[in-house]
C-alpha cells in the first residue's frame, strides 16, 4: 500500500516504479506501466502528465501502424477521471490508429466533458457509403455514438439517425442506444425495443453487445428478455444490474420501486 495515495501496489510494480517505467527507453515497460496506472487508478499529477504526453508518442509503433502505448494511455486517462486530459484526447481523435480513436472516444465518454461533442459529431457526419457488414469500418462508430449518447448530445440526433440502418449490427445497436438516451420519453421506447428484438440474434457476440447496451441505458422493459437471453448468466446479471441502478435512483428510501423488485427477482433466479 502506498501511504500517500492509499493505492495498493501489486507484486510486480509500485506506483513509483510504474511512473519511472513510463519514462523508460524500454517500450514494453512503458506500455505495461500505462496499463498499470489505469488499472490501479493512480490518479496523481505526475502520472496524469506522463500519460497525456504518451498520447503523442511516436516511438512505440507496430509494423501495421498501430500505437500500443497511445492506446493504453488513452484508456488509462479515462479511468483516472482528470479532465486536464480532455484537450489532448480530443487531438488524439485525429490519430490514424483505429484503436487509439476507439479508446479516446470511450475515455471522453467516461470523463463526461461536453467540449468533445463537436469533434465527435464531425467524425460521424460522412460515413463511408460503401461500408458493408463484411468490411472493417473506417472509424469506431459504435464508440463515437455511445459517447454522444452518454454526453447528452441532443444536437447530434440528425447525424445519429442514419446509423440505425448501418450494415454493421453493433453500430446499429450503438445508434439505438444513443437515440434512447437522447430522445424524449414518449419516443425513446422504440429504440429500447429495437435492442430487445436484437437479443434474438443468432450471433452470441452480438447478443453480448446488446446486453451491455441495455444495461447501459437501464431499459426496464427489457428485464425479462434479458433474463431469457441465450448468453452467460454473468453477463445477464451485469445487464440487469444496470437496470437496477436506474430504478434505485427513482426510489424513495427505504422503499424500492416495483421495477427494482422485479429486476432483483430476475437476478435471484440467475444466481
UniProtKB/Swiss-Prot annotation:
Keywords: Antenna complex, Lyase, Phycobilisome. InterPro entries: ARM-like, ARM-type_fold, PBS_lyase_HEAT. GO terms for molecular function: lyase activity; oxidoreductase activity. Its EC number is 4.-.-.-. SMART domains: EZ_HEAT. It is an enzyme of class 4 (lyase). It comes from the Bacteria. One of its GO terms (cellular component) is phycobilisome. Pfam families: HEAT_2, HEAT_PBS. Required for the chromophorylation of the cpcA1 gene product. CpcE and CpcF associate to form a lyase. Belongs to the CpcE/RpcE/PecE family. This is Phycocyanobilin lyase subunit alpha. It comes from Pseudanabaena tenuis (strain PCC 7409). The gene is cpcE1.
